Amino acid sequence: MHRLVASVIDTVVNLAKRRGFVYPSGEIYGGTRSAWDYGPLGVEFKENIKRQWWRSVVTGREDVVGLDSSIILPRQVWVASGHVEVFHDPLVESLITHKRYRADHLIEAYEAKHGHPPPNGLADIRDPDTGEPGRWTEPREFNMMLKTYLGPIETEEGLHYLRPETAQGIFVNFANVVTTARKKPPFGIGQIGKSFRNEITPGNFIFRTREFEQMEMEFFVEPSTAKEWHQYWIDTRLQWYVELGIDPQNLRLFEHPADKLSHYSDRTVDIEYKFGFAGNPWGELEGVANRTDFDLSTHSKHSGVDLSFYDQATDSRYIPYVIEPAAGLTRSFMAFLIDAYVEDEAPNAKGKMEKRAVLRLDPRLAPVKAAVLPLSRHADLSPKARDLAAELRRFWNIEFDDAGAIGRRYRRQDEIGTPFCVTVDFDSLEDNAVTVRRRDDMSQERIGMDAVADYLSARLKGC
């Protein structure tokens, strides 16, 4: 039975830490707030999400190509993009604890709890730490970009920024891609990479962090077709999450109000997931924005390079509009884990029913595709099982485990989402066959050892 998401989130966070999906960064030194490292299972899970996104958005289409641009970009790029001027958040400080918060986040949390804005503004908002009636400083603007200096001296000339989004690296390479890849609108450029934002209030596990990964694509279109393409990408990206196992009831679309649109956007629609956070359970997975011609126009103006496109078929020249589906990789990571978590019952070695925790991940996302398990640690069984695991490892990420009772080893694999367990038993020594157990229904099937690779291949398509 699937428990309510609100009660699942803490369980999944604990599972992620305990089983090696995610570790607090620098933990032996006390850690860094909202910074996380991805362990053996987490790094495989992340790579699988990226692989599915890349196949769906880039290599699975003839109208999209890939790019990997630099994390550090010149200051002029961010001046042109508007980030230096407008990439600010209103910051207030509690006069009780002297902690700083985004004013808009405090107000949004109040609205989510009470169903209306605070009548007297910040004066009605209690201190999040102490619960006392809040006493706040006046809001101040806080730039969220992280600075760095290149060269031996920290001067204005060497000032650069760590990118707060991957998009600008795509825009400044627009002309390069058009020329070398021989592309013309409608076409897109996709990119996966790290971005950095000096968030005032990071938190909610890996949902909001200062260092994060984005899966972004900029789709360049003739201006009159922008609205149609925008809706196409909203629908396409929403369906991607559903096809990879997210329950549609836990997804929704959120239309940004006109007064809260980013400086470049004509319309933005967020794909949100019901994470189960306190206050407001919904959180953004991905934003799909119509950025109009803002980006190419501003970079043309500031760089002096013509970034318009000449259409020979219509003998016309125009600045393409941009439709941007921008997904958070680590937010997707978190949503897929939460949505896959199920608790049911399974018999133990004595036949008694016990609680079983399962990650019912789509096999394409599962960090381990199959586990090879000798029935027991035995001089004849373990080597045979190891040889089979080595053969299968040529194709997939495979675990070998011969420690403990077979039932416990099944549970360990269920808990990390492994779709198949292959058991080598004493009969295997005679008939050269193994038992394949399915994760979700625990059904078992006996097949020849030399047929295991073909058996899994037929059931792990797209992995």
UniProtKB/Swiss-Prot annotation:
Q: Where does ATP bind?
A: 197-199, 207-212, 284-285, 328-331
Domain of life of the organism in this record?
A: Bacteria
Q: What is this protein called?
A: Glycine--tRNA ligase
What Enzyme Commission number does this protein have? 6.1.1.14
Question: Region Disordered: what ranges?
Answer: 113-134
**Quick one: where is this thing mainly located?**
cytoplasm
Which terms under GO biological process does the entry name? glycyl-tRNA aminoacylation
Please give the catalytic activity noted in the UniProt record.
tRNA(Gly) + glycine + ATP = glycyl-tRNA(Gly) + AMP + diphosphate
Q: What does this protein do?
A: Catalyzes the attachment of glycine to tRNA(Gly).
Tell me the protein family, please: Belongs to the class-II aminoacyl-tRNA synthetase family.
User: What does the entry list as the binding residues for substrate?
Assistant: R102, E165, F212, E213, Q214, M215, E216, E324, P325, A326, A327, G328
Share what the entry says about its subunit structure, partners included.
Answer: Homodimer.
Supply the source organism's classification: Bacteria, Bacillati, Actinomycetota, Actinomycetes, Mycobacteriales
Where does the UniProt annotation locate this protein? Cytoplasm
